[in-house]
């Protein structure tokens, strides 16, 4: 179903992992669905119980959540690796990140709340000659040009596999390809 959210015209899809992300998305969604140029909002939620972080989100982080993604664990400049995760698999992504930084210091953990918003913004930038200003491009900018990305979600891996096209990073897309 993440691919439906990614490809359906007039539908903005989100898959938050944490309740504070959901709150930021709700605020935006209520304005969006009532706007003259707005549209429908699809929230892909899970019944899986997740430990919730205790944090106060900055206005910048709330905006990034609505724009489609933010760094839960920012990479160091020139980092060799980033885990890119969406939805309830964040628990496994956090655990993997904690193990990986022992061997690959500086690796980042990127949370994707809306693959579609990230992709739409990036494609618009590519088509208008300003792809470097796309939110996803700015998110990936700290990584080494040779960095690898491991994408993970509980949906089809192609939902996030396109991240490799943004800055020509290698991608290992993980997810559910058959069910």
What are the functions of these language-model segments?
Residues 1, 6, 21, 25, ...:
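Thiamine diphosphate
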Residues 12-14, 172:
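Structural signal for short hydrophobic segments within the conserved structured cores
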Residues 14-20:
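Active-site nucleophile and cofactor-binding loops and adjacent substrate-binding regions
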């Amino acid at each position: 179903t993440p691919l439906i959210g990614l490809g359906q015209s007039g539908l903005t899809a989100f898959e938050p992992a944490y309740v504070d992300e959901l709150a930021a998305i709700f605020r935006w969604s209520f304005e969006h669905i009532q706007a003259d140029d707005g549209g429908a909002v699809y929230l892909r939620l899970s019944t899986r119980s997740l430990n919730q972080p205790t944090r106060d989100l900055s206005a910048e982080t709330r905006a990034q959540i609505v724009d489609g993604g933010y760094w839960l664990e920012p990479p160091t400049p020139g980092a060799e690796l980033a885990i890119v995760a969406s939805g309830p698999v964040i628990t496994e992504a956090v655990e993997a990140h904690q193990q990986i930084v022992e061997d690959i210091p500086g690796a980042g953990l990127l949370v994707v709340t809306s693959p579609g918003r990230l992709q739409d913004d990036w494609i618009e930038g590519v088509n208008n000659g300003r792809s470097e200003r796309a939110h996803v491009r700015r998110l990936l900018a700290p990584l080494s040009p040779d960095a690898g990305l491991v994408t993970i979600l509980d949906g089809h891996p192609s939902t996030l596999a396109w991240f490799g096209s943004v800055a020509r990073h290698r991608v290992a897309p993980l997810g559910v390809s058959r069910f």
